[in-house]
């Protein structure tokens, strides 16, 4: 019988038994026996961990202490054979590209993972593939130095021209005779109860929660969003009214030497909400999004002056906020995989 060498995925870095990355090396049988606790392929105990068949190939692949046929060691996504390296997570093996696509940092537009050596675009805290960095209305790619607007809720991007057209059209509708205004929305008692229960859970629900509420109540997404905005504004107004009534009551009823902030020597007992009531905090950085036709997607929340647009500049580290032009990075943005470590000689440099 032919002699066998063992092709082993040797020392593996492991984190919480979830993710490991290994590299392969060709060892002689004697070297392999001194480093791993597994039988030689000539031995009856050499069994492939995937197909449960004896390994009689010239080379044997070892991953995390387990033996495999070289033909069985494949990426669970693309089914290609794994060569020099592989990634292991939850007993599934992946090639480098598909591991990062599935478990790496996600593109804010397509929600797919980004491979570390790919060039990316960055706006605020959001990262995009270069091909995904485009206006979601006209689908035109945004170039370096171009002004654009960022929607806070879902990280969508809008070029300056489309935003200004939508804003101007909306302003013209508001200045009209009112004949084109939408009818007032009526919410049924059952739908109202559903919205109230959701409000008790969170006064500022995430987008996917609003989508679920819209599906359950049969209301438009925009209607659900406006209902939550109005509810927060109402509670804020009630809170201010309660404060004014407290001061008035204090002046009328307190005849003791207690402080102004108390009545009959006792501190006021207010119930404060544990979340900010200012609706301005929950608006988009530059505008609100609408769920109707594209030309109604935005409404300028500042009646006096328009907020300054964000700018894409030459590649640089983002240091601006939303009151100043937003920079755009075209640097190679290496993103490490979540909960993973690499062996020292395979460690990429992360920026």
Curated annotation (Swiss-Prot):
Residues 46-105, 105-169 form the LIM zinc-binding domain. SMART domains: HOX, LIM. The gene is ceh-14. Residues 238-268 are annotated as: Disordered. The lineage of its organism: Eukaryota, Metazoa, Ecdysozoa, Nematoda, Chromadorea. One of its GO terms (cellular component) is nucleus. This is LIM/homeobox protein ceh-14. Its main location: nucleus. Interacts (via LIM zinc-binding domains 1 and 2) with lim-7 (via LID domain). May interact with itself. May interact with homeobox protein ceh-63.
